[in-house]
């Protein structure tokens, strides 16, 4: 750890990497303790049963051996899969050397060792079966462990078949090694003390006390229901602060975890939970069995697709894969590049790890590319793959997505997103175009990796795609000319995407097969002039909790965006990745930018629909869900500049409060924020630091950020007031009128979010049929004129005019009695259909099921009256 660059420019990234490392080792130590307790009894040697640590000495010995193994295999601390392989190797050594009397099982009929050979139990194969590890990698870890033991204790490894120790009875000893005196009673204590001294000396040189992680893992909270699909930083910071300081005491962390109830004690059989370790090992098994067996070059069918283009693209594709993956997983560059990416390639032990990840990513890329080619040819609108297969941006996005999935599979902590984007010259908006297609065309993708891609897409949609330098603005300036001036004023346009030669020059190496003239730039595809490049961004930590969704085709376009004859057509990928100014090859007069922006906005609306519904449920105003959604949709379509350099949750919060003010609900901004903090995606900076422009300080433009109240009053209200006022102009509740379709007033109407769980009415008694529905707003509230309302916010305000919040007994009583439940806030495409978010939402409890944009028809008249 001391080798990390302590400069301020990299301190934030280093802090996150250290926290991720603590989280990785915490997960590994939990796995190790659980596996050890399944294989061995609690008390070993002459350890005092009342020992303050409650850690069996054999367990402690194995943990120290694992830490020593790290010195020979740095990849153990790079990703969770490698870490587990090292720990399973340690368990194998303990099973070979620890006396059989300390085992918690017998060889005969054991459920732990089920793999058999003619000579007995196959120990290594059984462990690989139990923990989903690779037998080849496990044997490699065992070999490195043997070398570490020889160096530390000056012992020579002997063949177990020659020594024939008693504790290996009925175990096939072929290829097993044995160390005499390693764990014998007479020398075990001295060996353990020697290991502890070595670990303590190494801890003093670094910043973390790795030994304490084994003891502290019961103190660090852990959610057994966590899917573990991405690195969990929720509690690692607390652990890091404790473990990084040698002065912190740990005696309050030594509680022994209680065992789950057994059926004999009245409990039920516990179902195995998906933990970060089981998730990582399951996805690693998929990568090993499905992807690793593939060739590391294009298949014959893919070569046929590539050679059938206007020119043979096979060599260009393979060359690009080599260059781009070398940029992501550097193996030949200097140590300086390694530090910038968190990958210290100066260490020779890192090169095999990076090479292995490159091979896995390339195989996955070729597999998905072939599947996409097959699917595109089945599209009636595509008869030539040349535009797609010659598009540089498409290939880079597909390679970057493959590399990110490989990193996610191994649960790596040394390269954190968006490092993949920075290495390849892509932007978040670029990557968002490929994720849905990647999931659709890789049918064997495990559920956990689909969840990871869902979480990644949420990050891209909610904020990263709206950052300065995103290629989103290069498409917006074409699709929405009205925002061009604001984009240019703020300098939001992306830089051109760097060519492959630029990537090679960054690597400071010469890739075999490149032209001898580096100044001749390789074509970046047909949209070279518009290809953007992402500026550097700070690493965003991954979500802890995500929800799997089924990626579906985008909803049909609005009439003002595309002709009616094209609504049902599926746009090919070449339309998505083509230059924004190119005409859509499907037909019509629209540009490819129109297609791209429409698809992107439809995804934004789907994500916003789920988050709005969840937040409205939390604040108990479900009846206003559609109004909030409609205001958000109108802002996205007509006041798109409000999203520039911002997070969509900032607009959702403001829309909810604006609707609450218009409808005179008893809801304050403080209540909204308190409930928002309970959402899984919540980050404090979302409502505490919002961009509202730049100021000139001594000739330097400095971004100005304010709190959400200031943003709401100064920026949001002036822009969104017409949409909020239009809610009042629509008149009374729809159920009090007869709609155009002839629906009877007051009759039930399908919910605008029909597949989402309805919070009203709610059953409040388990023994009686008693239901409670939210109180409707009175007609009097809706008939109030706009001039009598205040659109502005103040934290701590009363819910009614001239009334103190302390006297609002109804609101206080409601908050006291509300039993809030955790609502899943992740994007789930199964829950909201495309037709719902495409504009076919109906009014709650009545009204037409037509496009809700009709509710804003008198918008222009309303603006005139207000002005």
Curated annotation (Swiss-Prot):
Region described as Domain A: 275-476
Region spans: Spacer: 477-594
Free-text tissue specificity from the UniProt record: Ubiquitous.
Keywords from the named record: Cell cycle, Host-virus interaction, Nucleus, Repressor, Transcription, Transcription regulation
Domains as described in the record: The C-terminal domain (743-867) is required for binding of RPD3I and RBAP1.
GO molecular function, one term: RNA polymerase II transcription regulatory region sequence-specific DNA binding
InterPro entries: Cyclin-like_sf (IPR036915), RB_A (IPR002720), RB_B (IPR002719), RB_fam (IPR028309), RB_N (IPR024599)
SMART domains: DUF3452 (SM01367), RB_A (SM01368)
Record field: compositional bias (Basic and acidic residues): 530-540
Top-level taxonomy: Eukaryota, Viridiplantae, Streptophyta, Embryophyta, Tracheophyta
Subunit comment: Interacts with RPD3I, RBAP1, the Arabidopsis cyclin CYCD3-1, the mastrevirus replication-associated protein A (RepA) and the begomovirus replication-associated protein (Rep).
Location(s), subcellular: Nucleus
Keyword Cell cycle belongs to the record: yes
Principal location class: nucleus
GO biological process entries: cell differentiation; negative regulation of G1/S transition of mitotic cell cycle; regulation of transcription by RNA polymerase II
Location of the region described as Domain B in the Swiss-Prot/TrEMBL record: 595-722
Cited function: Regulator of biological processes that recruits a histone deacetylase to control gene transcription. May play a role in the entry into mitosis, negatively regulating the cell proliferation. Formation of stable complexes with geminiviridae replication-associated proteins may create a cellular environment which favors viral DNA replication.
One Gene Ontology term, aspect cellular component: chromatin
Name of the protein: Retinoblastoma-related protein 1
Start-end of Polar residues biased regions: 541-552
Domain of life the protein comes from: Eukaryota
Keyword field contains Ligase: no
Region span, Pocket: 275-722
């Amino acid at each position: 750890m001391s080798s990390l660059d302590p400069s301020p420019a990299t301190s934030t990234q280093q802090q996150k990497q250290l926290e991720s490392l603590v989280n990785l080792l915490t997960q590994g130590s939990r796995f190790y303790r659980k596996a050890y307790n399944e294989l061995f009894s609690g008390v070993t040697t002459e350890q005092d049963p009342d020992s303050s640590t409650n850690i069996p000495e054999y367990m402690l010995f194995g943990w120290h051996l694992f830490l020593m193994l790290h010195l020979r295999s740095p990849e153990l601390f790079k990703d969770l899969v490698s870490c587990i392989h090292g720990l399973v190797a340690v368990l194998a050594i303990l099973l070979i050397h620890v006396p059989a009397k300390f085992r918690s099982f017998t060889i005969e009929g054991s459920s732990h060792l089920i793999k058999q050979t003619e000579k007995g139990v196959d120990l290594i194969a059984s462990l690989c079966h139990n923990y989903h590890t690779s037998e080849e990698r496990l044997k490699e870890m065992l070999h490195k462990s043997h070398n570490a033991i020889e160096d530390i204790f000056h012992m020579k490894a002997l063949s177990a078949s020659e020594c024939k120790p008693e504790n290996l009875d009925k175990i096939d000893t072929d290829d097993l090694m044995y160390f005499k005196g390693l764990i014998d009673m007479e020398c075990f204590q001295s060996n353990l003390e020697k290991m502890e001294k070595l670990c303590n000396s190494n801890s003093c040189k670094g910043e973390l006390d790795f030994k304490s992680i084994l003891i502290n893992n019961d103190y660090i909270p852990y959610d057994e229901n966590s899917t573990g699909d991405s690195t969990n930083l929720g509690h690692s910071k607390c652990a890091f602060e404790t473990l990084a300081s040698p002065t912190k005491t740990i005696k309050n962390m030594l509680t022994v975890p209680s065992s789950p109830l057994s059926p004999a004690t009245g409990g039920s059989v516990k179902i195995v939970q998906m933990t970060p370790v089981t998730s990582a090992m399951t996805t690693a098994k998929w990568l090993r069995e499905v992807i690793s067996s593939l060739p590391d070059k294009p298949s014959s069918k893919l070569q046929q697709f590539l050679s059938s283009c206007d020119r043979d693209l096979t060599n260009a594709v393979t060359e690009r894969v080599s260059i781009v993956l070398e940029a992501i997983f550097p193996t030949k560059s200097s140590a300086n590049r390694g530090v910038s990416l968190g990958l210290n390639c100066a260490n020779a032990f890192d090169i095999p790890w990076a090479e292995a990840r490159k091979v896995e990513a390339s195989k996955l890329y070729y597999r998905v590319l072939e599947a996409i080619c097959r699917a595109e040819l089945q599209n009636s609108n595509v008869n030539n793959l040349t535009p797609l297969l010659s598009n540089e941006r498409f290939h880079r996005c597909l390679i970057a997505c493959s590399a990110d999935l490989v990193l996610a599979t191994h649960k790596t902590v040394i390269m954190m997103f968006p490092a993949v984007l920075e290495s390849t010259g892509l932007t978040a908006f670029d990557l968002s175009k490929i994720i849905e297609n990647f999931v659709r065309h890789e049918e064997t993708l495990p559920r956990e990796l689909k969840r990871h891609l869902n979480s990644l897409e949420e990050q891209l949609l909610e904020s990263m795609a709206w950052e300065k330098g995103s290629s989103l603005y290069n498409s917006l300036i074409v699709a929405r000319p009205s925002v061009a001036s604001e984009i240019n004023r703020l300098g939001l346009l992306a830089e051109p995407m760097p060519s492959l030669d630029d990537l090679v020059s960054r690597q400071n190496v010469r890739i075999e097969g490149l032209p001898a003239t580096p100044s001749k730039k390789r074509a970046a595809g047909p949209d070279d002039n518009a290809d953007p490049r992402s500026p550097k961004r700070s690493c965003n930590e991954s979500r802890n909790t995500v929800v799997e969704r089924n990626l579906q085709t985008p909803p049909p376009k609005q009439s003002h965006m595309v002709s009616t004859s094209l609504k049902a057509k599926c746009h090919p990928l070449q339309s998505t990745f083509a230059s924004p100014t190119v005409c859509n090859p499907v037909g019509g007069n629209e540009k490819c930018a129109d297609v791209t922006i429409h698809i992107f906005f439809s995804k934004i609306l789907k994500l916003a629909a789920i988050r709005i519904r969840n937040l409205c449920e939390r604040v108990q105003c479900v009846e206003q869900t559609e109004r909030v959604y409609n205001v958000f949709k109108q802002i996205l379509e007509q006041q798109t500049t409000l999203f520039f350099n911002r997070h969509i949750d900032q607009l959702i919060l403001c829309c909810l409060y604006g609707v609450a003010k218009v409808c005179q609900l008893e809801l304050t901004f403080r209540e909204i924020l308190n409930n928002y903090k309970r959402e899984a995606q919540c980050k404090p900076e979302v409502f505490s630091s919002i961009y509202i422009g730049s100021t000139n300080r001594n000739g330097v433009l400095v971004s100005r950020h304010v709190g959400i109240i200031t943003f709401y009053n100064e920026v949001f209200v002036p822009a969104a007031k017409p949409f909020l006022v239009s809610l009042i102009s629509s008149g009374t509740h729809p159920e009090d009128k007869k709609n155009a379709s002839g629906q009877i007033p007051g009759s039930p109407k399908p919910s605008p979010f029909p597949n989402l769980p309805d919070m009203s009415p709610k059953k409040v008694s388990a023994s009686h049929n008693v239901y409670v529905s939210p109180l409707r707003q009175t007609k009097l509230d809706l008939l109030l004129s706009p001039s009598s309302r205040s659109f502005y916010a103040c934290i701590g305000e009363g819910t009614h005019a001239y009334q103190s919040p302390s006297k609002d007994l109804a609101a206080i009583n409601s908050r006291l009695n509300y039993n809030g439940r955790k609502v899943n806030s992740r994007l789930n495409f199964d829950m909201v259909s495309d037709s719902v978010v495409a504009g076919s939402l109906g009014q709650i409890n009545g009204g037409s099921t037509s496009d809700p944009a009709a509710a804003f028809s008198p918008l222009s008249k309303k603006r005139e009256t207000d002005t």
